[in-house]
Curated annotation (Swiss-Prot):
The protein's name: Disease resistance response protein DRRG49-C
Keyword Nucleotide-binding carried by entry: no
Source organism superkingdom: Eukaryota
UniProt key word Flavoprotein: no
Annotated Gene Ontology cellular component terms: cytoplasm; nucleus
Inducing stimuli: Upon contact with the plant pathogens fungus Fusarium solani.
Signal peptide from the UniProt entry: none
Single annotated GO MF: abscisic acid binding
Keyword terms of this UniProt record: Pathogenesis-related protein, Plant defense
Lineage, highest ranks first: Eukaryota, Viridiplantae, Streptophyta, Embryophyta, Tracheophyta
Protein family: Belongs to the BetVI family.
GO terms for biological process, alphabetical: abscisic acid-activated signaling pathway; defense response
Entries under InterPro entries matching the protein: Bet_v_I/MLP, Bet_v_I_allergen, Plant_def-hormone_signal, START-like_dom_sf
Length: 158
């Protein structure tokens, strides 16, 4: 198995507590409301905390697909969230799992700094393709921007 690590950083004008609430606490409800392609996020096992398995159902290229997320950490006090994509048809054939470690911190002018570490655990000697990485980054950025946009458009959300 190979492990390939990628780091990302973004800034937001939204305060970290509010952004964490949208990205983590309320994500199962908000994400399908603000992103048309995401149809549902439902718990299939667990209570929402570490060990919980969630099924994210989405439409891509006219087909309904899903991925399974395993929650590994939810730290509301420190605005941190770790999870892995562990299954589903949205997971590339050459990848065993993709792990995400996300952390928000206070940024300039009351906003946030978002840091994300992504690890691809590949099967055998497989290497994630540039296309897989590019598509994964684009999807992640799209979700981040959509939920950030929701917070900006709804200033009473907190």
């Amino acid at each position: 198995m190979g492990v390939f690590n990628f780091e990302e950083e973004a800034t937001s004008i939204v305060a970290p507590a509010t952004l964490h609430k949208a990205l983590v606490t309320d994500a199962d409800i908000l994400t399908p409301k603000v992103i048309d392609a995401i149809k549902s996020i439902e718990i299939v096992e667990g209570n929402g905390g570490p060990g919980t398995i969630k099924k994210l159902t989405f439409v891509e290229d006219g087909e309904t697909k899903y991925v399974l997320h395993k929650v590994e950490l939810v730290d509301d006090a420190n605005w941190a969230n770790n999870y892995s994509i562990v299954g589903g048809v949205g997971l590339p054939d050459t990848v065993e799992k993709i792990s995400f470690e996300a952390k928000l911190s206070a940024g300039p002018n009351g906003g946030s700094i978002a840091k994300l570490s992504v690890k691809y655990y590949t099967k055998g000697d497989a290497i994630p393709s540039e296309e897989e990485i590019k598509n994964g980054k684009a999807k992640g950025e799209g979700i981040f921007k959509a939920l950030e946009g929701y917070c900006v458009a709804n200033p009473d959300y907190n």
